[in-house]
Amino acid sequence: MQPFGVLDRYIGKTIFTTIMMTLFMLVSLSGIIKFVDQLKKAGQGSYDALGAGMYTLLSVPKDVQIFFPMAALLGALLGLGMLAQRSELVVMQASGFTRMQVALSVMKTAIPLVLLTMAIGEWVAPQGEQMARNYRAQAMYGGSLLSTQQGLWAKDGNNFVYIERVKGDEELGGISIYAFNENRRLQSVRYAATAKFDPEHKVWRLSQVDESDLTNPKQITGSQTVSGTWKTNLTPDKLGVVALDPDALSISGLHNYVKYLKSSGQDAGRYQLNMWSKIFQPLSVAVMMLMALSFIFGPLRSVPMGVRVVTGISFGFVFYVLDQIFGPLTLVYGIPPIIGALLPSASFFLISLWLLMRKS
């Protein structure tokens, strides 16, 4: 049996074309919305409309990764729907091409799309998002902020600050503050395990603070305190311009970060959930295409194209909601994050198989 027969290639070409067209429309719509949102920030530093456009372009890979499952569902629905409307699927079945063989052809098309999704999520999207945020920070603040996969660096007057992670809007973790004098000699190093922003007094409240005084080159003195304060121009809004969300990290980056959090005795549940969600996202692409096929052979066999689109959007939205609900629930009830990440895809896969096989 050939890996890709004539009918496999025909079905694959049709589905691939409609998926790419759908993905282009979804990413374009998202890009327009993002560009308009970035225009609100124009005027800060040298950040202008051109900068907003560049930021939007650099964010495209992340949007591609986000919208790929939805595009797979809608595109497969449209492509298979066109084949059904032209009675081509009926002719295929009449010539001995069974329903499960059609499903296999769809899955063969899904394989390169799954690999493409994995490649974008692991290498292209994280780098693009990091470049976008650094570009925006450079335009707004003149290079005083720099984001990396391991954390972010910031220049605060004569001080340099390294922040391992930004936890939420007003909480930081792993803060190292390197204080220099006007002659650029290192005066002190202060490390805090966590920091929470106090909006009333405009300061950061530090906890578990270790400080080393280097003003005397012959003797280094150290001190440890339970808490402290840090007055700085680095507000949550400014750090949010460049800080990478867990969604923007690669699988390998998340894996290393989870290991670091566990080794330091910190809760890694949120990042584990993000890691498993990224691992299983390519599976959701295949599941969405299988779901589209089950609809075409079932309830959507002879309905207008508009109904298929609405149905696809509805089920894509349901899948998204389930994905957003089950994940946090596993963290709340102490269930392994892998279950919360896998359950929506597994549920839709079983539903698709049932719809395909009930009239086979």
Curated annotation (Swiss-Prot):
This is Lipopolysaccharide export system permease protein LptG. It is a multi-pass membrane protein. Component of the lipopolysaccharide transport and assembly complex. The LptBFG transporter is composed of two ATP-binding proteins (LptB) and two transmembrane proteins (LptF and LptG). Residues 36-63, 125-278, 336 are periplasmic. The chain crosses the membrane at residues 15-35, 64-84, 104-124, 279-299, 315-335, 337-357. It comes from the Bacteria. Belongs to the LptF/LptG family. Residues 1-14, 85-103, 300-314, 358-360 are cytoplasmic. The gene is lptG.
